[in-house]
Curated annotation (Swiss-Prot):
Organism of provenance: Leuconostoc citreum (strain KM20)
One term of GO molecular function: magnesium ion binding
Oligomeric and partner information: Monomer.
GO cellular component: cytoplasm
Protein name: GTPase Obg
GO biological process, one term: ribosome biogenesis
Location of the OBG-type G domain: 160-336
Cofactor entry: Mg(2+)
Localization, UniProt: Cytoplasm
Superkingdom in the source lineage: Bacteria
Cystine pairs: none
Predominant cellular place of this UniProt entry's protein: cytoplasm
Binding locations of GTP: 166-173, 191-195, 213-216, 283-286, 317-319
TM spans (from-to): none
């Protein structure tokens, strides 16, 4: 039994550090020249598979992830410190998609496998890189490149670790609703659950697992009666079984008789299920006759020589929550050492190569639009916006360099073709400039 766990998050890589303008000022060193260092690289965000994780629950509480920026350059040609990459643990079998494009960035299938999902910006260059014979003392530097930003959709096809079995109305749906994020329909009548409800259980110690409330079993299920085969196939793929038994004795039902009927059906379908780690969970201990019925039930189970092993018995009341947390902790302990059944197959297929995602540079695409509201030309485009952010607009020399870069990209020609005239206002990334066409 598999279901798809999903989460949408935003990841933002670190900006590169800024290069600086600096000059060598030392005694006896005339005309020392430029000495400004480069900025350090920003941190990337990298997903890494941790086979100990079972769900995407962590991403429901934390949807925004940022890496640190690189350090700015220093004097004497010193390069700023590069930021450390940020590693985020994901479960085995996670598929990563770009929300905006729908592109699959990668499938993370092997323990320890890594995938760079956003790449940190490179550091801006200091003025030491811009010296030429014509300009031996440039006041030019670059700001750091912005880090990449992406909205990602994570998908994980999950198999239930723990299966809740028992007769209809044994309290399976109620227990699941108490310990997990699932919201099954719960009512006081038989056959409440006709298809599996699945929830993710998270303990205080950060352990988590997937629990399934399986369709109520009836006598004859191993021969296909009712939901028989469908139910038993679900049980077959769980690693730990919690066998819920109603202790209330309502409608004259005998707890031990019901317990034995479930075991018989499981054994007739597949005897190996009986050897799987399991806990017997007497339920509805808040009811008037439950304590008395539990004493009798324990005696009958202890005297049953036909059981493969004497089971752990942990009574609970889902209504009052009594015994629920100890039960969940013991369940997690069993899962830590439970063998993986043969039927517990991986449910993802590898659709892309194991590789770091190849980030392709942006094309020279930009837009030129006239804004009636502000009466100015608006220039847009990812590459232009990146160039602007890497331009130190506090220095005239770098602004002039930015103008030359735009001209080289064809922005001047596009403005002139669109009808721009000398003196028109031009807005780029919320900053205003005056258009002057150069031949």
């Amino acid at each position: 039994m598999a279901f798809v766990d999903q989460a949408e998050i935003e990841v933002k890589a670190g900006k590169g550090g800024d290069g600086i303008v600096s000059f060598r000022h030392e005694k006896f060193v005339a005309m020392g020249g430029p000495f400004g260092g480069d900025g350090g690289h920003g941190g990337s965000i990298i997903f890494k598979v941790d086979e100990g994780l079972r769900t995407l629950m962590d991403f429901r509480y934390n949807r925004h992830f940022k890496a640190q920026p690189g350090g700015n350059g220093g004097t004497k040609g010193m390069t700023g410190a590069s930021a450390e990459d940020r590693y985020i643990k994901v479960p085995q079998g996670t598929t990563v998609k770009d929300v905006e494009t729908g592109e699959v960035l990668g499938d993370l299938l092997e323990n320890g496998q890594e995938l760079v999902v956003v790449k940190g910006g490179r550091g801006g260059r200091g003025n030491i890189h811009f010296a030429t014979p014509a300009n031996p003392a440039p006041e030019l530097s670059e700001n750091g490149e912005p880090g990449q930003v992406r909205k990602l959709k994570l998908e994980l096809k999950v198999l239930a670790d723990v299966g809740l079995v028992g007769f209809p109305s044994a309290g399976k749906s109620t227990l699941l609703s108490v310990v997990s994020n699932a919201k099954p329909k719960v009512a006081a009548y038989h056959f409440t659950t006709l298809s599996p409800n699945i929830g993710m259980v998270r303990l205080d110690d950060a352990r988590d697992f997937v629990m399934a409330d399986l369709p109520g079993l009836i006598e004859g299920a191993s021969q296909g009666v009712g939901l028989g085969f469908q139910f038993l196939r679900h049980v077959e793929r769980t690693r730990v079984v919690l066998h819920l038994v109603d202790m209330s004795g309502i409608e004259g039902n005998d707890p031990y008789t019901q317990y034995r009927k479930i075991l018989d059906e499981l054994g007739q379908y597949d005897e190996t299920i009986l050897n799987r780690p399991h806990i017997v969970v007497p339920t509805k201990m808040d009811m008037p006759d439950s304590e008395e019925n539990l004493v009798k039930f324990r005696q009958e189970v202890a005297a049953d020589s036909g059981l493969p092993v004497q089971p752990e018995i942990m009574p609970i009341s889902a209504l009052t929550r009594e015994g629920v947390q100890p039960l969940m902790r013991l369940t997690a302990d069993l899962l830590a050492t439970a063998p993986v059944p043969e039927s517990y197959r991986p449910v993802v297929e590898k659709v892309s190569n194991d590789k770091t995602y190849d980030f392709k540079p942006e094309q020279h695409n930009f837009t030129v639009e006239w804004s009636e509201e502000t009466e100015e030309w608006v220039i847009g485009g990812a590459e232009i916006e990146k160039l602007f952010l890497m331009t130190n607009i506090q220095r005239d020399a770098t602004i002039m360099r930015f103008g030359r870069q735009l001209r080289h990209m064809g922005v001047d020609d596009a403005l002139r073709k669109a009808g721009a005239k000398d003196g028109d206002d031009v807005r780029i990334n919320n900053s205003d400039f005056v258009f002057e066409f150069s031949d």
